[in-house]
Each structure stands twice: as C-alpha cells, then as structure tokens.
Amino acid sequence: MKGTVNFTPGPSQIYFTVEDHMRNAFREGIPSLSHRTKEFEMISRQATDGVKELLGIPSDFHVFFTSSATEIWERSIQNLVATTSLHFVNGAFSKRYCEIATQLGKKPIKVEVPSGHGFNTNVPHETAVELVALTHNETSTGVSLPMSFINQFRTQYPDALIAVDAVSSLPYPQFDFSKIDTLFF
C-alpha cells in the first residue's frame, strides 16, 4: 500500500503520523477511559469544539459521534420521521437511505434520476413531508449537489427537517446552517 493514493471512499492511505498518535494514546490509556471520566469529557469537548470550528457549525447545533452512516440513516429516520420523508436518489448511498426508511415502516417519497445524474431545479412539492434527505456528494457516482439546490428546500419545505449526507465531501464545502437541520459525515 505504500505510495498508493486512492481517490475512493476507502481504503484510504493513513497519514504517516497516525501510528505514533495511536501508540501515544495507548501509552496514556485513552482507549481504556470510561466515558464518565473528566479526561474523556475533556477529549470529547476538544473533538466537538474542533469539529464545530473546522466546519463553522453554529454554537446552538449539537455534535454526535456515531459508528457509521448506516447508523445515522437509521437514527434520523427513527427519530425525525413519523410517517413521510422525501429522498433524492441518484446513486447507491442515497438509495440506501431511502430503503432504510421503507425498512423502518415509513412512507418515503423517492425522487430518482439515473445513477450518476444530477437533479433539475424543478423540485416536486409534496405535502406533509417531515424530512428531506439529500446526499451532497453521492459517493458511488461522484455527483455533487450544488449548494443552491440544497438551500432551496428551507423555503420550499419550511416545516420539514433538512438532512444532508456529506460523508464524502466534508470538510471542504461550506454549508449554510440556516438552510439545513442536520449534516452528517
């Protein structure tokens, strides 16, 4: 793997200092810390503050650490959707988010274009949508949604929560947090 650079979601080449950071963490006992200790609380606060600073996340937004995008998709559907979500599908990952809504007994509305294509700006107006699910950069195809496309939903769906999957695009784009409710990566 040495010298190999992958421009795919994974595996990714690890930065050369990671090994030393891991050894240091084990020497300091960090992997064995209880999540109830002051030390862990300090590490969590530093990580949260760092993520907020890096991404420009407003102070009234919360940061949660989860294990995977699948967990985020499941939790967002379980906790934010009583009945109906609106999904924009243009590849494998946006499709999976929609499938999870169906598996959890919800009634997702799917706006789908062929894999690898973007969406036109004529967005259908569905009533009683509780969540609009968008994938900023569809990892399976590399198609990226323009910010103007994402930002229009706050006006079109003022009562819906706007969820943006930014797994393969952060930290580079700058999101307008007044236009979205949840951003995950």
PLM-predicted stretches and their roles:
Residues 1-34:
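N-terminal "arm"/small-domain region of PLP-dependent enzymes with the aminotransferase-like
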Residues 26-75, 96, 100:
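Conserved N-terminal alpha-helix of the aminotransferase class I/II PLP-enzyme fold
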Residues 64, 84-88, 130:
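Conserved beta-strand elements of the Class I
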Residues 79, 96-107:
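Active-site-proximal loop->helix
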Residues 80-95:
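Conserved PLP-anchoring active-site segment centered on the Schiff-base-forming lysine
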Residues 117-171, 182:
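Active-site phosphate-binding strand-loop segment of PLP-dependent enzymes
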Residues 176-185:
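Conserved active-site segment immediately N-terminal to the catalytic lysine
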